[in-house]
């Protein structure tokens, strides 16, 4: 599994990859945009807001896999979500509003809608609210380029970081802020190794792996043996699972897990 050398790739892709139209597999697309999600998206658009599926579900959809956890997001803030749902007589649950999430309740199910304009962030050991982000800022704030894409109900893929190109070329590339966030969230180390298992022949920037190795001692701070076991099991279930586990150990993970 050879690394990609240099950081020029990220800088170049930032300038070239913006908005793309996909040839949509209708059945797969219906798994992303269920009738309930369509209904919520229609309401948000009626009031001038955007609505997209974001993150890992988009990655899996492009890879032709069934998306598991579907994250549905909007640029409306939580108070605007509640206002719109009230105006349209949509039952909702606002217990998650502290995290920017409002749940729309339908007869056939529920849709969690999370605002990209409001989020909680851990910085220097303290939790603070971040407001006013747009779609591109939200994409830049994710961990990997392949997890930063979003897609709307019309099948338009929004790619601000070159994630589609990386996905097609089996590259696992950290977004710049992830280098700093690892100190606050060591789980990002496990997620990086897990992402290698999405591909038959993954590649990565050399500098990313150097950062991963340098932060290996932080794995000792991860609380909960059950969660660690879940992450390791997930890595083993991926492609080249044993090889990736050996790679983790050679980088020093076995000393801290």
List the predicted regions and their residue ranges.
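Extreme N-terminal basic, low-complexity initiation segments
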Residues: 2-5
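Catalytic cores of the polymerase beta-like nucleotidyltransferase superfamily
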Residues: 7-257
